[in-house]
């Protein structure tokens, strides 16, 4: 998208840090967010040390979590934070009054509907949302929690156990939460600003102090005769994540601003450079845009870990895992050799939410419906829909290519390495092509971008996918005919044997 004119930024949040914003030349809402997250990090350490389950009961822990979370929301978003509180209140009323058989439907419609109305108002009423505080992030996290909890209550109270999948059975909630539990789950200071989202049962186990035992029992510590487990320290995990956060911040300030995504649709840049160099810049600019997401999600993960939330048992080497609610795996994203591998490691908790409320429950067209829900949840910028609609055929084509050709490259290590290099390069190119409209936001620059790229991935999918589908169909027909011929031959030889058997009798 073209660079926005220099217009003073308006915020509904606190202006106490405005001098710091001017000094750093960083928008005030971003300064408020960063300072509040750093405050939350310190508060989380204090919460873990002085309000641990051994020192304070669940009620006290719930109250402190909720009150600090509300204060942070008001500081960052001012009166816009009312939208968060209204959605939580509305959906709590629905949860308490709705019939169990419909609780998930009503909650889903109410939460997604309210989120969508707020996003429409930001984009189309308040000047594309670029000159006002963005409160949609926390609202998106709250929407995930509201809808996932509603489905989990429906699973636990309205469905038979044998009708549930393994994950649904594990996460099913057998009683409606109290008002305090509900508010604490949605408004706690560990995750109100940047999430990540978490499952209700995991959060309640953390508040009540059962989360360590549950995870270590899952890792079979009972086999060693343990009945009580030590409280693992998150310091190492938090330190590692803060180092990553700082590196991402350095990358963002030093690299990202020098490779703006909007340059991909600059008329002069398009006219003066070849397709190859435009493709190279596309890859560089998209990769340069990732650290801001890495920064926000890794910092959010560190905040939760500092409070003691996020412990996920032990790995195969016996090391502590603090990735229960981690939202990304940077190494796996950057080295992904398939579109699926990247999706599985990017915005992980949102992917789990989409699977829980849509993909695993949709009777038909689960992939398309999941992408549509993802686009709707992200917002109403046209670029989001270009991204997710484009992702559908590319995903289907990638699956078809993998199923048709991967087995040819598994016969030797050299071929496998060659296959991995080719699939890594093609995956990164495809991802850059897919996500650029997401970053450009608007329709006009998106169409200009597609034209500058000659719609090459769209055309490639349109040509390759039908051919591979026909090839698969022909192979299935060939195998079916081969099996039928084999069956007929065996039957032909069986007749004389049967007749000979009758004569011998």
Across the structure, where does each feature detected by a protein language model lie?
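Non-catalytic, membrane-anchoring transmembrane segments at the edges
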Residues: 1-505
